[in-house]
Amino acid sequence: MKIGIIGKGFVGSAVQFAFSPNTGCDAQIKVYDKDPAKAIHSIDEVVNDSDFLFLSVPTPSNPDGSINLDVVDSVLADINEVQKTKPIVLLRSTMVPGSSKKFQKKYPQLNIVFNPEFLTERSANFDFINQSRFILGGDEKNVKKCSELFRWRFGSTIPIIETDYETAELIKYMNNCFLAAKVSFMNEMRLVSDKCGADWEMAIEGFI
């Protein structure tokens, strides 16, 4: 298998780790990042010598709270410009439901699949190879090919959910929102603990 990685932050680096010889995998890996210090290959090399392209770039919030997809759009435009082969592009950035379909319509020559990440920055490598499920959203044929990639790498140890763009994107948002809700809940409970004089560490031990 030939794996291309665009965006070598902690998410892209986790993909590189998971498919590297360090984990017993023999995939051929090429890496591009806009930061020359992180880039190993050119974007042309990564795009045209890969079966699967993992795109992991930022989607920061705009001042009004909406998601800014400019970086994703820019990279997809670059891929579209240099593409000579037809790799599957796996989008891993957080996006509102409907975003992947819009990009697929804007760049019909690309094979786009939404494959959200569920990683924490400090343990991203471990999280990637031990995650509870893989989510794949998009065209059925492309999704099946991505499933084959993950089965090739992980066997049947990790469940794979195959669905459409919108459902995959919603799953990612649900996960993010639920995590935020848990953090908010625990922060509130800590305030209650401090106010009533409870032993917070013991409360945590008993709760978890």
Place the predicted regions along the sequence by residue:
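Rossmann-like NAD(P)(H) cofactor-binding subdomain of soluble oxidoreductases
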Residues: 52, 60-124
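Gly/Ser/Thr-rich loops at beta-strand to alpha-helix junctions
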Residues: 11, 94-98, 179
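Short, charged/polar "capping" segments at the starts of alpha-helices
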Residues: 37-41, 97-101, 141-145
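Internal alpha-helical scaffold of NAD(P)-dependent oxidoreductase catalytic cores
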Residues: 25, 104-113, 124-208
